[in-house]
Amino acid sequence: ITLSGWDTNISNSENLIIRYMRFRPGAANVHTGGDSMDALWGRDNKTFMIDHCSFSWNTDETVSTYRGQDGTVQWCIVSESLTVSGHSKGRHGYGGIFGGDNVLFQNNLIANHTSRNPRIGGGCMGDPTKDGGSTATLQLSNNVLYNWGYNTCYGGGYAYTNFINNFLKPGQGTREQVRYQVIDMGEATKPGGFYVNGNYMDGNAEITADNAKGSKMSGVTEGANKTVVSETPYTAEGFDSATVTSAADCYEPVLAQAGATYPYRDAID
């Protein structure tokens, strides 16, 4: 099953499972359906799983799911956002916004996007800046990031994020100044925290051995809105028991198994 032509919105859903589907909106309706068409997006979701799906050819983000709780996005291909699609902001091909409390993003292939590879979007259900809002805890592990343009993973306000054991491989579209950037941590006006460890940077053994040498800090390090760099992983029931391999060992399985593989991959994947 392939959904095309329009974005797919799963916001405010609960007890949701999506498996073995393809989402490729394209740009044919960019001027009639709104120019911010994600292949799939949702916020304020509760108890959800997105597994073995393929997402591409969007005019805004490819996959965005944030400000929810108790979810997993795994074994998906998130690829080929449309950089020049007719979006009102011009060049606009992004990977996605990942977030939510007690949410795991694991074993995904995130490839060929200029930025938001992904962006970490913080907070739980509702607005984290208002009464009842809170800081989310999430994990990105064993993902393969390939051929980012001018930014890798960044953001992270109102979130405590484990960014661990991911495989990063720059490509022909990667700008030289971010070629070996593992992550850009924090937002200056929002509190948050990161645990970054075990990530493999293809072509740079020094950064593979010490991820701090490939990490940038865009948050502030003092005051109420500081971004904390943790020496130990953050914990949450949803991912504490997840099986996480080394970054080097996740590369081949993700390439072989990610995406809508049942009954077989299409020609795009």
Stretches with model-predicted labels:
Residues 119, 124, 134-269:
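Extracellular beta-rich repeat passengers
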